[in-house]
Amino acid sequence: MSEENKTSNDNEQPTGRGGQNQPAILINTQYIKDLSLEIPHAPEIFKEIKSAPEVQINVEVGYQTLENNFYNVELKLNMDGDVNHQKLFILELTYSAVVALNVPAEHLEPVLMIEIPRLIFPFARNVVTNCLVEGGLPPFMINPIDFVTMYNNRKTGK
């Protein structure tokens, strides 16, 4: 039996601005920058919960350049829940990630405004669900967010 040594470049990472083989996206850390849950009509409001609350969600994405190819991406979720036309809860979350990027300059903003939020969204959604449940409220699962449409709307001024 003979052994053959085969080499393949299929698994190499793309070479970016640094000229070295590096991952295109590297999430260094994720963190909760700000988290607030208010239940303004507690404890009386708990008697009113007989069905799922009406929930309004506002989502914002932003980023700042740190140094070299490092960026801080923020995903802000503001939620208001109402039951029987009364405020059940107000939840505000700013979930952030520090990332290193090795992408061409023309792809930088879409990666920061679409891909990174898409990667960290499941973690932010988990924080929201846990916060609501630990706050004595019914669990609420946020549907996936279309960050591409959000980005395009922002670019066109909608």
What does each of the following model-derived ranges do?
Residues 2-119, 123-158:
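N-terminal intrinsically disordered, cationic/polar leader segments
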